Design a protein with these regions (language model features):
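Detector for the canonical C2H2 zinc-finger "Cys2" submotif
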Residues: 21
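Short, flexible, mixed-charge glycine/proline-rich loop motifs
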Residues: 2-13, 24-29
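A generic structural signal for well-ordered coil/turn residues at beta-strand boundaries
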Residues: 13, 48, 74, 125, ...
Length: 178
């Protein structure tokens, strides 16, 4: 790749070919788009997100594990544990990885089942993975992570930091993910 084909650090998102680095021609918009330099076709695919629904129980009843975010977007908001699925990562593995990274709670990917799949208005595909219910007393103590203040329990459906998290939590508490 020639130095002139390297996109500048301040270039607009999606303004250069991801295969060869050449800038798209003036006026190129919409998807898919073809690079005039190398012929590669680029598609604007949704960014998949894995979200964990970890039910727990104690003497107060059933609850879901949630986190308080310390990063943007929705810093300070309460959300279900989740994040982007890595390249070539199985979505079930992503569910348990995100659960571990954001809460310290370990789970097996073989135990994850698809509870829901929803598309957000900004183009993200969210896959909600339901894990088996477990005793709250068996969970590790809440502690801060790189992205959260730690975990806590959501006992009823309430508005969460992300609208689709709210929809999924409501569906869980209404018994639609049994």
């Amino acid at each position: 790749m020639s130095p002139s084909q390297n996109p500048p650090a301040d270039s607009a998102p999606d303004s250069h070919c991801s295969s060869c680095g050449a800038p798209y021609e003036e006026g190129v918009s919409g998807w898919p788009r073809t690079c005039a330099s190398c012929g590669a076709v680029a598609y604007r695919n949704p960014l998949p997100v894995a979200v964990a629904l970890q039910p727990v129980y104690d003497i107060k009843g059933t609850a879901l594990v949630v986190i308080t975010r310390t990063i943007a977007p929705a810093r300070g908001g309460i959300a279900l544990p989740g994040g982007f699925i890595d390249h070539r990562e199985d979505w079930r593995r992503a569910v348990v990885r995100e659960l571990m990274e954001e809460t310290g709670i370990d789970a097996a990917s073989r135990d994850v089942r698809l509870a829901d799949a929803m598309s957000s208005p900004d183009g993200h595909l969210l896959l909600f993975g339901l894990l088996p219910e477990r005793p709250a007393a068996a969970l590790p103590p809440p502690s801060a992570t790189d992205e959260t203040e730690g975990w806590h329990l959501l006992r009823t459906a309430t508005e969460l930091a992300f609208p689709l998290h709210t929809v999924a939590a409501r569906a869980f508490f209404e018994g639609r993910y049994v």
